[in-house]
Amino acid sequence: MAATATACPAPPPPRSLYRGVALAAPGRRRAGYGASSSAARRWPGCRRRWAAHRIRTVSCAYSPRGAKTITACSWNEYVICSDIPVLIEFWASWCGPCRMVHRIVDEIAQEYAGRIKCYKLDTDDYPQVATSYSIERIPTVLLFKDGEKTHSITGTLPKAVYVRAIEKSISDSEQ
């Protein structure tokens, strides 16, 4: 009398594994673990375990904990009525140089947390705000202090240019 072993299928990997990860291209198989292999027929959970091992993480180009996105409705609350200097990046989703400025603004938001507020505004979604501040080219970064525009920087420039303007704005507000 032969004992038959029934293997319980392995539970699927938790959904948290799939956040920010990329799976390998379909159609590629590893010997012994394909759908038609005898191992897959005998132990159905085997394939799932193998797929979980194939998951690779994707490194993020920049940290998502940077500048927050604002809207035209929240403009007065976050920019005009702010008691500390505010940096606003005007950008558009189709603009390549804007992505480079995103990284700089995100770094500045983390480095100057508490001393300056950093926000992003999509000019395609809110053109009325862009036209009211004469934004004709993007990326454009504006610095506000006490509700008034103090600096305007247009184009993709080194981080030192933005930091210099911020330091000047912060030193003016402390005096």
UniProtKB/Swiss-Prot annotation:
Record GO terms (molecular function): protein-disulfide reductase activity
Location of the protein in the cell: Plastid, Chloroplast
Site (Contributes to redox potential value): G96, P97
Residue pairs linked by disulfide bridges in the UniProt entry: C95-C98
Source organism superkingdom: Eukaryota
Keywords annotated in UniProt: Chloroplast, Disulfide bond, Electron transport, Plastid, Redox-active center, Transit peptide, Transport
SUPFAM superfamilies: Thioredoxin-like
Entries under InterPro entries matching the protein: Thioredoxin, Thioredoxin-like_sf, Thioredoxin_CS, Thioredoxin_domain
Keyword Nuclease: no
Coiled-coil portions: none
Cited Gene3D superfamilies: Glutaredoxin
Transit peptide segment: 1-59
Main localization (coarse): plastid
Domain Thioredoxin per the UniProt entry, residue ranges: 61-171
GO CC, one annotated term: cytoplasm
Active site, per annotation: C95 (nucleophile), C98 (nucleophile)
Known role: Probable thiol-disulfide oxidoreductase that may be involved in the redox regulation of chloroplastic enzymes.
Stated family: Belongs to the thioredoxin family. Plant M-type subfamily.
Name of the protein in question: Thioredoxin M3, chloroplastic
Annotated organism of origin: Oryza sativa subsp. japonica
